[in-house]
């Protein structure tokens, strides 16, 4: 029996973080939480998750934070969410190493589908 994938949810808004946890818990993932970029980096240094779902605009966030995540966890897919998006932000996000990008308010169904696909692809690559 394979262990269920570990998803790190990084979001400074408590209500949004709770909602994301509730939705992804229902998918059977093991969840870890962080409320800002620093907490997220510490969590990744302790143990690399299978996927990181993160806000962009939060304390210790931004594209330099995404770059640091990719340095510590180069093979970990990163799903980025932001309320301050647009075409340029999306292009930047993908260039800086995000695997998927969502504008807020996020459509939960689309988000769960992206998480499912990225985790499936990662399992295939890792064999």
Which ranges hold each PLM region?
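Acidic, metal-coordinating helix/loop segments flanking the phosphotransfer/catalytic sites
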Residues: 33-51
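Short amphipathic alpha-helix used as the core "switch/output" element in two-component signaling
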Residues: 42, 63-75
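Non-catalytic signal-transmission and effector/linker regions of two-component phosphorelay proteins
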Residues: 1-8, 109-127
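Conserved phosphotransfer microenvironments
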Residues: 55-65
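Two-component signal transduction core modules
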Residues: 52, 78, 101-102
């Amino acid at each position: 029996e394979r262990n269920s994938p570990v998803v790190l949810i990084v979001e400074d808004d408590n209500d949004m973080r709770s909602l994301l946890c509730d939705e992804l818990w229902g998918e059977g993932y093991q969840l870890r939480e962080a409320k800002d970029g620093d907490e997220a980096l510490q969590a990744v240094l302790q143990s690399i998750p299978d996927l990181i779902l993160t806000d962009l605009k939060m304390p210790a966030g931004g594209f330099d934070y995404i770059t640091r995540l990719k340095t510590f966890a180069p093979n970990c897919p990163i799903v980025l969410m932001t309320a301050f998006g647009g075409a340029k932000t999306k292009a930047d996000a993908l260039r800086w190493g995000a695997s998927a990008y969502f504008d807020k308010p996020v459509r939960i169904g689309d988000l769960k589908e992206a998480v499912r696909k990225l985790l499936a692809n990662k399992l295939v690559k890792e064999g």
